Amino acid sequence: MTNMRKSHPLIKIVNHSFIDLPAPSNISAWWNFGSLLGVCLGLQILTGLFLAMHYTADTTTAFSSVTHICRDVNYGWLIRYMHANGASMFFIFLYFHIGRGIYYGSYSFMDTWNIGVLLLFAVMATAFMGYVLPWGQMSFWGATVITNLLSAIPYIGPTLVEWIWGGFSVDKATWTRFFAFHFILPCIITAMVMIHLLFLHETGSNNPSGMNSDSDKIPFHPYYTIKDILGVLFMMITLVSLVMFSPDLLGDPDNYTPANPLNTPPHIKPEWYFLFAYAILRSIPNKLGGVLALVFSILILVLFPILHSSKQRSMSFRPLSQCLMWMLVANLLVLTWIGGQPVEHPFITIGQVASVTYFFTILILMPSTALMENKLLKW
């Protein structure tokens, strides 16, 4: 009798993806973030579903319904803060996952990489719409400012903004459609994750050396399942500690004030995980230029396979490229800090310098350094 996991049509798929999957024997903890993102997605869908049971997407009752969830629903505060801080964890892991892909040259798997970039856009859209839902001051003004950026699109811009708003300002129609999209997008993300994995399993995983590892593979289970479980445990300890001890650490105090269209907050800013892109947007005085820079700051990831000029895939044995990689990380941290500061001197100048450095490092410094390394190695 054949083993059921190898013969059953459905279980066979799971077996080939998570049990008998040949994996490189030398992948490090940097490869844990894929599974952690999967756990985060499941957690977000689950907590989001329970929140949706009590939330009302109406401008008059949205803020009260969130208060009701925290005060009156059994463990509602826990579900709400797990969902809010779970989003932060999601983005931390997402950025680590992308960073690992850049460092070890995983972008060479172009299909997997491009689906990943689309996934990033989908997750960012979902997070933005989720931030808008509690109908606090920052929710309302964040929605107004970010949707209003589309008015920079020539000719169709103003009409497009009013179409998204469902009126002449952010109001009930906007809230209802944002809630609908926030609810459906995670399902689309789940489908995209499956395509992401499908493409990945066509080629097999990359490894820290960047070399072909077909001659040295081990089964995914039990070696990497146990390693992933350890990662999940660390993640849950961090998330639960954050939720229990300081749930509002990553939030904005302005969002505890009900939305008021007549009163603008002194400093409108998005959640911390969008601050780097927000800083790039603000660093350009022209509206259309700012919007293009904002989009391109994420879309630039698509260019990594094209810009790769080194004869080696990974940065493991390329010290000069490693220096540039960490310079890029430091630059992104500076941009994140600047995005949270008011628009005044010296923050404006620092933001502009950091924005130029960001694009200059990726488009010019990294490819030219890789070519120089080839020369030094006489390749």
Swiss-Prot record:
PANTHER family recorded: CYTOCHROME B
Positions with a binding annotation for a ubiquinone: H201
Protein name, per record: Cytochrome b
Physiological role: Component of the ubiquinol-cytochrome c reductase complex (complex III or cytochrome b-c1 complex) that is part of the mitochondrial respiratory chain. The b-c1 complex mediates electron transfer from ubiquinol to cytochrome c. Contributes to the generation of a proton gradient across the mitochondrial membrane that is then used for ATP synthesis.
Keyword Transport tagged: yes
Note: Heme 1 (or BL or b562) is low-potential and absorbs at about 562 nm, and heme 2 (or BH or b566) is high-potential and absorbs at about 566 nm.
Entries under InterPro entries matching the protein: Cyt_b/b6_C, Cyt_b/b6_C_sf, Cyt_b/b6_N, Cytb/b6-like_sf, Cytochrome_b, Cytochrome_b_C_euk/bac, Cytochrome_b_N_euk/bac, Di-haem_cyt_TM
Protein residues bound to heme b b566: H97, H196
Cofactor binding notes: Binds 2 heme b groups non-covalently.
GO cellular component, one term: mitochondrial inner membrane
Domain of life: Eukaryota
Oligomer and partners: The cytochrome bc1 complex contains 11 subunits: 3 respiratory subunits (MT-CYB, CYC1 and UQCRFS1), 2 core proteins (UQCRC1 and UQCRC2) and 6 low-molecular weight proteins (UQCRH/QCR6, UQCRB/QCR7, UQCRQ/QCR8, UQCR10/QCR9, UQCR11/QCR10 and a cleavage product of UQCRFS1). This cytochrome bc1 complex then forms a dimer.
Protein family (similarity comment): Belongs to the cytochrome b family.
Outcome, altering V353L: In strain: Isolate JLP 16556
Cofactor or coenzyme needed: heme b
Binding site residues for heme b b562: H83, H182
Subcellular location: Mitochondrion inner membrane
Membrane topology, from the record: Multi-pass membrane protein
Matches recorded under SUPFAM superfamilies: a domain/subunit of cytochrome bc1 complex (Ubiquinol-cytochrome c reductase) (SSF81648), Transmembrane di-heme cytochromes (SSF81342)
TM regions (residue ranges): 33-53, 77-98, 113-133, 178-198, 226-246, 288-308, 320-340, 347-367
GO molecular function, one term: ubiquinol-cytochrome-c reductase activity
Any one GO BP annotation for this protein: mitochondrial electron transport, ubiquinol to cytochrome c
